[in-house]
């Protein structure tokens, strides 16, 4: 095969320049280490937004047009002894925030008052304030710490901090802690698994060395890219997991094949070249398949999916580069010493050692239909719960209960309607000046129409101050000089627009709230006004609709490119189709298990998490792209080994038995490594 010849010569070239390759990689890795302490700092948003949607454009319009339509910090005050009706309650809140005057950032504080009655709790023992910043305000971790220190404890109250800046800070901090926790669990277990697989100290240590190198290079590369692109705070965890799994898998494939070739090759150079021509070629095409699967994330105009796509592509690229250059160079330097320092008896290539897999493969090949039906029924049964999937968007429930954001949310919902935290925001544009008679009449009509909707709990705007006032009354009211009215107009309106905030009676993401969004978008409006919707419920709804609209294109992309890559590798029309079909079945089975455990809550007591009643839509897409690529990884390695023997014997049955016999142990070992790495993240506090 021409491709094999290329990889054979590539292996010989690596052997000739092995020392140079190792030194170059060592310099790159060492020069990356100083950046590690600050890798998390550029990741500042969840990324759950479609930047091209009407809601995102409306949000950007408000950020440019209103003075304090930027990050918001929420401070919740609760007292068991003082009522909100007592003047002392507001006095203590004011005193608590007094030191904010020394803050060097422009800000605005919205206190609870008669005109802001929604800031008072239903039980009259809680209230919260909103500290708003300008859209271009950079609330770094240091600035947030300064803010928290300036907010003084109230004498008779407990206070809790919330808002998106706190959520992002909590998520970043928890991500760092989770990475350390996962490493503490994964590293010793991975070492044990590698020792059981390779049975020698040197062979077992190489995958750890490559995995650590991959982690360093990947984190620093994403840090650099985050200076150029807005990347989601969830990128690091997912990318790190993908990178480590791929690197360790590729190490297992290459090292095991190298040790096998050492037993039959006349020289180390020839063994390395043969390894590259077989396992190296399989790894290259496997990487292309994973690359194609993850690149489908770029089809979605969602920042979070784009971010994970960037992280995944970086992970695959670095894993491939290390596995196809640094790893062979190290193997060339180590040579026969790869089998030194044996900790367990080494019978790696003894035929009796392969008896189990040969027996199983023989039984399967002689009764293929029976095994196919049994496995198919099993996978379909596992996948059946997926028919009950309830896709949604994750909220603060993914954070641990001890985080500031989660504590704020849990306390908030005891005293307030949770929906007040996530109102729908209507940007109402008028053709004539906002305070003209015609515009005010249109605004009053719109306000009344919204209030009549059965799903609407409350509407706030400049024509909802008093139910007794009509358009004519508001016209005369805003003609009068009044500092409070002027302040209200400055905060909510411009010359040709104003903002309505609307609270739904139903939870964010519910069918009723989504129906409300559609109803408002299709309202029959006065010709003088035009509305745009934004706000968290609208952004989330747009994200869901965007994912549903673009998923068929991503599906075709993944299937088509996977088929083409396998077609080039295997020179068969049927085998790529078979591989894609099996991947689809295993993916459905995985989704079914996810529904059973994480949506419906089975085993949640043992796994120590709170079921959310839904599965995150973006996570389902990420799992599809990543898992399809990963399962293709094993398909490529197994089928390439089967084809290699088929080209020698032209016997289909024997080649299948041979491929399973010589590949299954290393594939199951690689899968075990992936299970260990993924399992270590089960102990993470971010769900």
Question: Which sequence ranges carry the predicted segments?
Answer:
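Membrane-proximal amphipathic alpha-helices
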Residues: 47-48
């Amino acid at each position: 095969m021409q491709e094999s010849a290329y990889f054979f010569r590539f292996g010989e070239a690596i052997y000739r320049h092995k020392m140079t390759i190792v030194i170059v990689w060592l310099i790159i890795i060492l020069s990356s280490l100083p950046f590690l302490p600050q890798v998390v700092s550029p990741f500042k948003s969840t990324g759950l937004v479609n930047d091209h949607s009407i809601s995102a454009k409306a949000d950007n319009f408000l950020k440019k047009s209103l003075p304090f339509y930027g990050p918001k910090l929420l401070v919740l005050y609760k007292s068991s002894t003082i009522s909100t009706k007592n003047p002392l309650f507001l006095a203590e809140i004011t005193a608590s925030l007094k030191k904010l005057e020394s803050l060097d950032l422009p800000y605005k504080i919205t206190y609870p008052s008669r005109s802001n009655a929604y800031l008072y709790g239903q039980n009259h023992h809680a209230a919260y304030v909103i500290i708003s910043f300008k859209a271009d305000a950079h609330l770094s971790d240091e600035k947030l710490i300064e803010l928290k220190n300036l907010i003084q404890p109230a004498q008779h109250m407990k206070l809790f901090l919330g808002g998106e800046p706190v959520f992002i800070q909590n998520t970043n901090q928890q991500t760092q802690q989770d990475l350390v926790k996962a490493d503490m669990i994964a590293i010793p277990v991975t070492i044990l698994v590698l020792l059981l697989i390779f049975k020698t100290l040197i062979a077992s240590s190489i995958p750890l060395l490559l995995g650590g190198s991959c982690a360093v290079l990947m984190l620093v590369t994403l840090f650099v890219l985050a200076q150029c692109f807005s990347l989601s705070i969830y990128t690091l965890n997912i990318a790190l997991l993908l990178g480590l799994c791929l690197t360790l898998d590729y190490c297992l494939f290459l090292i095991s094949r190298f040790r096998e070739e050492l037993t039959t090759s006349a020289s180390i150079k020839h063994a390395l070249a043969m390894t590259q021509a077989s396992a190296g070629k399989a790894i290259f095409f496997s990487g292309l398949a994973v690359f194609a699967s993850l690149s489908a994330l770029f089809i979605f105009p969602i920042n979070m999916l784009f971010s994970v796509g960037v992280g995944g592509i970086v992970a695959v690229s670095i894993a491939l580069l290390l596995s196809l250059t640094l790893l062979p160079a190290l193997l060339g330097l180590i040579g026969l010493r790869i089998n030194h320092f044996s900790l367990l008896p080494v019978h790696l290539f003894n035929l009796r050692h392969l008896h189990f897999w040969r027996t199983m493969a023989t039984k399967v090949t002689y009764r293929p239909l029976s095994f196919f039906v049994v496995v198919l029924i099993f996978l379909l049964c596992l996948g059946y719960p997926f028919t009950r999937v309830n896709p949604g968007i994750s909220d603060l429930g993914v954070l641990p209960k001890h985080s500031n954001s989660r504590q704020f949310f849990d306390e908030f919902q005891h005293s307030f309607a949770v929906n007040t935290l996530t109102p729908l925001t209507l940007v109402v544009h008028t053709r004539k000046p906002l305070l003209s008679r015609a515009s005010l009449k249109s605004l009053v009509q719109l306000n009344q129409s919204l209030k009549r909707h059965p799903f609407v709990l409350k509407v706030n705007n400049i024509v909802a101050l008093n139910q007794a006032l009509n358009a004519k009354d508001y016209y005369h009211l805003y003609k009068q000089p009044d500092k409070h009215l002027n302040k209200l107009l400055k905060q909510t309106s411009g010359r040709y627009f104003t903002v309505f905030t609307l609270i739904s009676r139903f939870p964010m993401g519910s069918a009723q709230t989504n129906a409300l969004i559609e109803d408002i978008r299709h309202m029959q409006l006065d010709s003088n006004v035009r509305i745009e919707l934004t706000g968290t419920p609208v952004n989330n709804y747009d994200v869901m609709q965007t994912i549903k609209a673009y998923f068929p294109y991503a599906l075709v992309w993944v299937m088509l490119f996977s088929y083409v890559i396998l077609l080039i590798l295997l020179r068969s029309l049927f085998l790529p189709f078979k591989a894609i079909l099996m991947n689809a079945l295993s993916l459905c089975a995985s989704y079914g298990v996810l529904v059973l455990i994480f949506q419906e809550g089975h085993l949640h007591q043992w796994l120590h998490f709170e079921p959310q009643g839904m599965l995150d839509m973006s996570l389902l897409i990420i799992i599809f792209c990543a898992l399809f690529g990963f399962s293709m990884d094993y398909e490529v390695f197994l089928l390439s080994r089967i084809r290699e023997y088929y080209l020698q014997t032209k016997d289909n049955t024997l080649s299948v038995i041979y491929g399973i016999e010589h590949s299954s142990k290393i594939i199951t070992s690689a899968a075990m490594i992936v299970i260990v790495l993924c399992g270590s993240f089960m102990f993470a506090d971010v769900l």
